Amino acid sequence: MKSLDDLDFDNRFARLGDAFSTEVLPDPIAEPRLVVASPAALALLDLPAEASDEPVFAELFGGHKLWSEAEPRAMVYSGHQFGSYNPRLGDGRGLLLGEVLNQAGEHWDLHLKGAGQTPYSRMGDGRAVLRSSIREFLASEALPALGIPSSRAACVIGSSTPVWREKKESAAMLLRLAPSHVRFGHFEYFYYTRQHDQLKQLAAFVLEHHFADCGAAERPYAAMFRQVVERNAELIARWQAYGFCHGVMNTDNMSILGITFDYGPYAFLDDFDANHICNHSDDSGRYSFSNQVPIAHWNLAALAQALTPLVEVDELRASLELFLPLYQAHYLDLMRRRLGLGVAVENDQALVQELLQRMQGSAVDYSLFFRRLGEDAPEQALARLRDDFVDREAFDRWGEAYRRRVEAEGGEQAARRQRMHAVNPLYVLRNYLAQQAIEAAEQGDYTEVRLLHRLLARPFEEQPGMERFTRRPPDWGRHLEISCSS
């Protein structure tokens, strides 16, 4: 393990030059204090958990101090927002402090969110509020524990700096980690501004550092785009299988690495609703839960358009056509595992779709259903679960088909239970749990947010005394829509 003074910086993106980012120093927040830190994320930087206890920790990630090797820069990019192209976005309140090289040879971006105004702030104050910072922190650490690729969050630093949104709130900073912060929108920016030399420079940078195995291909950029499609197909399959709704799938919020990125008004499903809209600002439902698959494909097509100076259109189209079958294969495999099924058979897709149709419109908690399905033998589990369904006879028919499917595979119930509990979480980051932790934190009590973070780091393991986190949400906490305000 290292100390905060010993981090090894290797700022590769900064070396691309001023066409790609602008030098900006962090604007410190007043009276910085640690709200919560992630030992697992700090370990990616070879830092021990105790590093967050040092006074200099809050000063560094509250914008008061800076390593001499750091090169803070605001990145420029554009993107399609709710389907409309915005020609100039960029880091409006975040700074890429630099890239840390860990002992495993991995580069990790240090991105400080809420670091003040930049040339891309667009009338904004450059700040992030405590509320949104806690939400991003919790999700960034909860999703990887579920096996969903994501950026990571090392810490949240609170302050006494006031900011105004719908009401007066306090500013905070979040340290986000990722192997890269390059977005689809980076490529769009250089394509639509006709800076094709810079577009190729960016593509070469991403190829060298993040898709090196594509470098030996006959057409490296075509191979790289195909991998981007493959990674996103698997990512979206994991979102859908675990009931995660991102809420703002603009192309500037899509990582070139195929990881979950830029958390805003996200949600995990409570009662299953394929049409759930978690973003209060999404009047048309563009980014509803069921639309995430076609929107991901749309976003990949937007990226493909930006790559046309580098890759033949036919090759881009061929890769795009792979998205849906790849997604379906990953999704069906995940759902099969969630149902405790180990062997693929022809009617598995129909079995999954029929279950979701029975869930729709019923008071079925999406996460708890799968957990409880594995608790006992199918007959007993199905008998307990049927009361949650509106059409119980239809559910009984599904249950009988499922029971026969389990019976055909054979095996002991104890092994089935262990197998299902290993992929079906008992603890899920529900919006009402995050809201309760936020309300306590806004009063200066960080106990709940720290407890929730520790709990969600082990979502599949039953943890003594944590029964209240396994319950269905109260009426006020069901289907919460969250504002983009942050």
Curated annotation (Swiss-Prot):
It catalyses: L-seryl-[protein] + ATP = 3-O-(5'-adenylyl)-L-seryl-[protein] + diphosphate; L-threonyl-[protein] + ATP = 3-O-(5'-adenylyl)-L-threonyl-[protein] + diphosphate; L-tyrosyl-[protein] + ATP = O-(5'-adenylyl)-L-tyrosyl-[protein] + diphosphate; L-histidyl-[protein] + UTP = N(tele)-(5'-uridylyl)-L-histidyl-[protein] + diphosphate. Its cofactor is Mg(2+); Mn(2+). InterPro entries: SelO. Signal peptide: none annotated. The keyword Metal-binding applies. Keywords: ATP-binding, Magnesium, Manganese, Metal-binding, Nucleotide-binding, Nucleotidyltransferase, Transferase. ATP binds at G90, G92, R93, K113, D125, G126, R176, R183, D262. The active site is at D252. Mg(2+) binds at N253, D262. GO terms for molecular function: AMPylase activity; ATP binding; magnesium ion binding. It comes from the Bacteria. Disulfide bonds: none annotated. Its EC number is 2.7.7.-, 2.7.7.108. Pfam families: SelO. It is an enzyme of class 2 (transferase). Nucleotidyltransferase involved in the post-translational modification of proteins. It can catalyze the addition of adenosine monophosphate (AMP) or uridine monophosphate (UMP) to a protein, resulting in modifications known as AMPylation and UMPylation. Belongs to the SELO family. NCBIfam families: PRK00029.1, PrtAdtaseSelOPseudom. This is Protein nucleotidyltransferase YdiU. It comes from Pseudomonas paraeruginosa (strain DSM 24068 / PA7) (Pseudomonas aeruginosa (strain PA7)). The gene is ydiU.
